[in-house]
Design a protein with these regions (language model features):
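Rossmann-fold dinucleotide-binding core
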Residues: 92-172
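NAD(P)-dependent dehydrogenase/reductase Rossmann-like domain
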Residues: 266-322
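Helical "substrate-binding/catalytic lid" subdomain
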Residues: 162-284
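Hydrophobic beta-strand scaffold residues
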Residues: 26, 46, 112-113, 154, ...
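NAD(P)+-binding Rossmann beta1-loop-alpha1 motif at the extreme N-terminus of oxidoreductases
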Residues: 1-63, 85
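Hydrophobic residues within alpha-helices
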Residues: 15-16, 101, 146, 187
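Rossmann-fold NAD(P) dinucleotide-binding segment
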Residues: 50-111
Length: 322
């Protein structure tokens, strides 16, 4: 199987690295020539353009920063789509747009899967990231061996579009967690508590979360370098808000979270790291939310292990259609 990968950014580059590490025949494409040269030095092929990549590969994976960019890339690839071609969309994108693009692929005889990832760049780097996959069951069974080279836990979410719907929900939850962690840390500092002790108390309590156990460390170190930027999270929050509005759900926290992140973006820059949002409260209180003993970057300390499918509670393994 020949695999193409478009988009070698913070997440995409690490996912593509997992394919190389697992000896997949890989060809890459990115607008950054130096990044492509680095992949070539590691054994990857280099594509001239998206159309050539689709023409030469059995599977093409995209991991891009916005729905508009994904659509533009698909416009280039579509003339080369046909029977035997598979498109895996690993970008965080709009569920209606992924269904539209998937329909175009299917009209040409190809197959499409929306399969965004979750778990952070550090887990993408080690192949331990989680993957949601939206497609019919037969297609899922066919692409599962490739997905388990990219990540550890793979969840079949249903039809095309369901994975993207769930993905933006998880990013909404992660942002809500981040903001509450920021408020908790600043309040404890103001109350005279030691921040390292505060971190540990949160970690071993009912108030812990994946975001706390990862991003709070970067906040306390001072690097705030989570490799995820405010423009990207605002895109994802907007997609989640759109889903709620489309389904007549009167959200209260979501608009507030969007306003806070927009304010952070206006203060610190469009592509500031999301963890820089702590600075709003540091500036408001005059407090420094720093502590010794925390890392500047996240390292996944779990060893890479073979990926596998996970199932919702009470669900048995389905049988693929004949």
């Amino acid at each position: 199987m020949k695999v193409g990968f478009i988009g070698l950014g913070n997440v995409g580059g690490k996912l593509a690295g997992s394919l190389l590490r697992n000896r997949i025949d890989l060809t890459v494409l990115d607008r950054n020539a130096q990044v492509m040269a680095d992949f070539a030095a590691r054994g990857a092929g280099i594509a001239e353009n998206a159309a050539a990549l689709m023409r030469e590969c059995d599977v093409v994976i995209t991991c891009l920063p916005s729905p508009a960019i994904s659509a533009a890339i698909m416009d280039e690839m579509l003339p080369e789509v046909g029977p035997g071609k598979t498109w895996l969309e690993m970008s965080t994108t709009d569920e209606a747009e992924i269904r539209r693009l998937a329909a175009l692929v299917e009209q040409k005889g190809g197959t499409a899967v929306d399969c965004p990832v979750s778990g952070g760049c550090h887990r993408a780097d080690t192949g331990n990231i989680s993957i949601f996959a939206g497609c019919d069951r037969q297609t899922f069974e066919r692409v599962l061996p490739l997905l388990t080279r990219l990540g550890r836990r793979v969840l079949h979410t249903g039809a095309v579009g369901t994975a993207s719907t769930l993905k933006v929900m998880t990013n909404y939850l992660a942002t809500a967690n981040l903001l509450t962690c920021c408020e908790a840390l600043v309040t404890m500092k103001a109350a005279g508590m030691d921040l390292a002790t505060t971190y540990e108390a949160m970690k071993i309590s009912s108030g812990t979360s994946f975001v706390h156990e990862t991003e709070s460390q970067l906040i306390l170190n001072g690097s705030r370098d989570v490799s995820f930027t405010m423009d990207l999270i605002l895109k994802d929050l907007g997609l989640f808000q759109t889903i709620a509005e489309r389904n007549n759900v009167p959200l209260e926290m979501s608009p507030m979270i969007i306003d806070i992140m927009k304010d952070g973006q206006s203060r610190y820059g469009e592509r500031a790291n999301t963890d820089d949002i702590i600075r709003r409260l540091e500036e408001a209180t005059g407090l420094s939310i720093l502590a010794e003993g925390f890392p500047a970057e996240l390292i996944d300390d779990e060893p890479e292990e073979p990926g596998y499918e996970v199932f919702p509670p009470g669900r048995a393994r389905p049988v693929a259609a004949e």
